[in-house]
């Protein structure tokens, strides 16, 4: 009787135990990451050939205490290695774990290798060769605290490598995990199975192998036991011959049929090739199709199971499309697959909620480093596709109401960019902005007291509802997460798509970028202020400080300004401003662009202007600025500098976004200036609920100064 250990992915231990017991294993004991079991040689080879769930089968050789590297060396050398494999064979060591003395797995592997080689040289005066690629013998050493376990890896390569999958698409599932997903799905051999997002076909092929009684190890070309001195070749030949007979018979007798589709034709060709190598190609029908074209391949029956591992996004920009995909998929399941079972495996339970289906079973498992969930559903017939209530219904109703009012208003105003929703409801803390044909959803970062998974779920519900209410294709929605910006992070670059969209604002055309930066290049709340500046600037010299993308300069220029001067520290934004000016025909020497620290430039210029617009950051500590800037603390210093640039009958429009900003009116008067708040005049209909989004002032020379 052999003592053996079968390893597997975490979360699959109970399934593996049941599988080994069905094969005839005795004394099965679950530990994290695997199962200890007992069995004779036949059972040992059967487990290697037939286990669909095990990652490796190990034969323990020795276990000993390790307090130093010498203990490790002596414990390994105590094993009679020449009795295990011949000196003419190659070997490799896999070492995992550390303790206070063995702090590096590579060092541990080196000590084990030395001990094995020295064992041969002392007894035979010869040494075996180490081979990193496909060695004849693999030695597995696991160190946990002060205990080391040495085992012969009978598998060689991991058992998930069945031998049929040479080519894979992106993010493939390991075959043993795919087998576990199928077993947990409730699918029964003899019934049909559909995978509408099949990738390289692993789920379908594994199920077809189960249905046709094909041993998962039948196609492997390399094993870790064939160079073992105790290898029973006759017994192995008997078992593999028996498995081949069963596979041929199973292929003829199975009534199961399998259907797979994927949008990627190249991946579908890989799937077909994989199925041919696995010997189950005649059972599986593959098609290259977009999931939106999914139909039930057996509308008249029998009913079966839909099993899939749908895509999930690690990048924020992919989430709207994935949310739309899951929502559409849920509707298709209800309309076309009534009476079927559905089982989905995903690293994103929040995306699965977008199906709007109620799961009746749920399992957890690891897919490499990812925590994943598998959910099973019973699909009820629903030919009209009517689901339950729309997710985030309160939000959807508010958005629908706002859209009805604001779309009409915006058309009358002659604007394409405006806010549709701004955290109107506390549970849905997002801003929704329309930019022509596209929509930007910005999530305000939730408080730390809110469960991150709950916040993510709520965001997904918002996106789902936004797409539905606005009848928007998912590629027209851009998702951003907005946090309170401080100093150098305020213009942080998020992506590098370089996609610009030309939009209209009154008589101006402006370039926006919805993906690459936290902001889009157009501050919507300053729309009326820009319009006012256009009217104020006719025949005047206009200065735009902290100019960002120069949108105020565009309005001033279109309003008939004699000249515009646009100053910003960022080369990127000045180039953007130049594009904005050029698309409106505002070119030539009278439209200057200056890259400079605005505060330093103010101190060093002797020019004068009729209209000055300044919208400084609330706080800034840019590397290019010598000191920090705080708008509340420093606005008087700013006004003192601006006074010398302002012509006698000129006007400064001063705006900022600091909530609770207090203008030092006494200090302003002492400078010989007058300030008048015009915040209410600059706030538009789409920002009616957020009166504190900015404050705005007109500052002029006092009567005495004039």
From Swiss-Prot:
Residue intervals of the THUMP domain: 43-154
Broad EC category: transferase
Localization: Cytoplasm
Chain segments annotated as coiled-coil in the UniProt record: none
SMART domains found in the cross-reference section: THUMP
GO molecular function: 23S rRNA (guanine(2445)-N(2))-methyltransferase activity; RNA binding; rRNA (guanine-N7-)-methyltransferase activity
EC number: 2.1.1.173, 2.1.1.264
Top-rank taxon: Bacteria
InterPro entries: 23SrRNA_methyltr_KL (IPR017244), DNA_methylase_N6_adenine_CS (IPR002052), RlmKL-like_Mtase (IPR000241), RlmKL-like_Mtase_CS (IPR053943), RlmL_1st (IPR054170), SAM-dep_methyl-trfase (IPR019614), SAM-dependent_MTases_sf (IPR029063), THUMP_dom (IPR004114)
Any one GO CC term of the record: cytoplasm
Reactions accelerated catalytically: guanosine(2445) in 23S rRNA + S-adenosyl-L-methionine = N(2)-methylguanosine(2445) in 23S rRNA + S-adenosyl-L-homocysteine + H(+); guanosine(2069) in 23S rRNA + S-adenosyl-L-methionine = N(2)-methylguanosine(2069) in 23S rRNA + S-adenosyl-L-homocysteine + H(+)
Pfam families per UniProt: Methyltrans_SAM, RlmL_1st, THUMP, UPF0020
Keywords for this protein: Cytoplasm, Methyltransferase, RNA-binding, rRNA processing, S-adenosyl-L-methionine, Transferase
Chief localisation class: cytoplasm
Entry's family note: Belongs to the methyltransferase superfamily. RlmKL family.
PANTHER family the record matches: RIBOSOMAL RNA LARGE SUBUNIT METHYLTRANSFERASE K/L, RIBOSOMAL RNA LARGE SUBUNIT METHYLTRANSFERASE K_L
Function: Specifically methylates the guanine in position 2445 (m2G2445) and the guanine in position 2069 (m7G2069) of 23S rRNA.
Protein's UniProt name: Ribosomal RNA large subunit methyltransferase K/L
Source organism per UniProt: Yersinia pestis (strain Pestoides F)
Gene name of this polypeptide: rlmL
């Amino acid at each position: 009787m052999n003592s053996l250990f079968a390893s597997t992915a975490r979360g699959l231990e109970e399934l593996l135990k049941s599988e080994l017991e069905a094969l005839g294993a005795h004394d099965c004991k679950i530990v994290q990451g695997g199962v200890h079991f007992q069995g004779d040689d036949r059972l040992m080879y059967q487990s290697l050939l037939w286990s669909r769930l095990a990652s490796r089968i190990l034969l323990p050789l020795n276990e000993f205490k390790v307090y130093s590297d010498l203990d490790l060396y002596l414990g390994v050398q105590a094993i009679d290695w020449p009795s295990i494999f011949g000196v003419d064979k190659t070997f490799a060591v896999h070492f995992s774990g550390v303790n206070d003395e063995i702090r590096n797995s590579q060092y541990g592997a080196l000590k084990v290798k030395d001990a094995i080689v020295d064992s041969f040289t002392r007894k035979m005066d010869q040494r075996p060769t180490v081979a990193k690629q496909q060695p004849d013998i693999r030695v597995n050493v696991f160190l946990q605290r002060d205990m080391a376990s040495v085992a012969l890896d009978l598998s060689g390569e991991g058992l998930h490598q069945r031998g049929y999958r040479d080519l894979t698409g992106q993010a493939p599932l390991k075959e043993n995990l795919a087998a576990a997903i199928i077993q947990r799905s409730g699918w029964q051999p003899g019934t049909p199975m559909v995978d509408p997002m099949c990738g390289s076909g692993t789920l379908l092929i594994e199920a077809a192998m189960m249905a046709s009684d094909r041993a998962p190890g039948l196609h492997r070309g390399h094993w870790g036991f064939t160079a073992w001195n105790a290898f029973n070749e006759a017994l192995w030949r008997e078992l593999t011959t028996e498995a081949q007979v069963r596979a041929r018979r199973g292929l003829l007798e199975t009534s199961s049929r399998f259907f797979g589709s994927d949008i990627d034709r190249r991946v579908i060709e890989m799937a077909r090739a994989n199925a041919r190598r696995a010997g189950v190609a005649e059972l599986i029908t593959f098609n290259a199709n977009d999931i939106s074209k999914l139909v039930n391949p057996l509308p008249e029956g029998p009913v079966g199971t839909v099993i899939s591992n749908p895509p999930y996004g690690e990048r924020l920009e992919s989430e709207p499309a994935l949310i739309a995909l899951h929502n559409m998929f849920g509707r298709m399941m209800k309309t076309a697959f009534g009476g079927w079972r559905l089982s989905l495996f995903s690293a994103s339970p929040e995306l699965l909620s977008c199906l709007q289906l109620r799961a009746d079973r749920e399992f957890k498992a690891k897919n490499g480093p990812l925590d994943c969930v598998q959910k099973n559903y019973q699909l009820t017939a629903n030919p009209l596709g009517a689901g339950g209530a729309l997710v985030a219904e309160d939000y959807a109703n508010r958005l629908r109401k706002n859209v009805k009012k604001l779309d009409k208003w915006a058309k009358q105003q002659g604007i394409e960019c405006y806010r549709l929703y701004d955290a109107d409801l506390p549970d849905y803390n997002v801003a929704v902005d329309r930019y022509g044909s596209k929509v930007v959803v910005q999530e305000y970062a939730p408080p730390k007291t809110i469960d991150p998974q709950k916040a993510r779920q709520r965001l997904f519900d918002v996106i789902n509802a936004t797409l539905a209410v606005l009848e928007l294709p998912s590629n027209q929605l851009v998702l951003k997460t907005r946090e309170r910006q401080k100093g150098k992070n305020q213009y942080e670059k998020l992506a590098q798509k370089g996609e610009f969209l030309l939009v209209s604002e009154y008589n101006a055309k402006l370039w926006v970028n919805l993906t690459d930066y936290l902001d889009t290049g157009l501050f919507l709340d300053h729309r009326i202020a820009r319009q006012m500046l256009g009217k104020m600037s006719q025949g005047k010299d206009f200065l735009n400080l902290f100019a960002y993308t120069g949108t105020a300069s565009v309005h001033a220029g279109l309003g008939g300004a004699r000249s515009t001067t646009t100053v910003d520290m960022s080369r990127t934004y000045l180039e953007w401003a130049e594009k904005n000016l050029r698309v409106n025909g505002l070119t030539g020497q009278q439209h200057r662009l200056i890259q400079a620290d605005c505060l330093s430039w103010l101190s060093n210029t002797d020019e004068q202007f009729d209209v000055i617009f300044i919208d400084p950051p609330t706080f800034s500590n840019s590397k290019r600025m010598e000191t920090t800037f705080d708008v509340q603390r420093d606005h008087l210093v700013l006004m003192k500098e601006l006074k010398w640039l302002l012509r006698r009958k000129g006007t400064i429009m001063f705006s900022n976004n600091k909530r609770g900003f207090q203008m030092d009116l006494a200090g302003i008067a002492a400078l010989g200036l007058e300030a008048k708040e015009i915040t209410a005049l600059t706030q538009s209909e789409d920002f009616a609920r957020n009166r504190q989004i900015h404050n705005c002032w007109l500052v002029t020379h006092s009567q005495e100064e004039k």
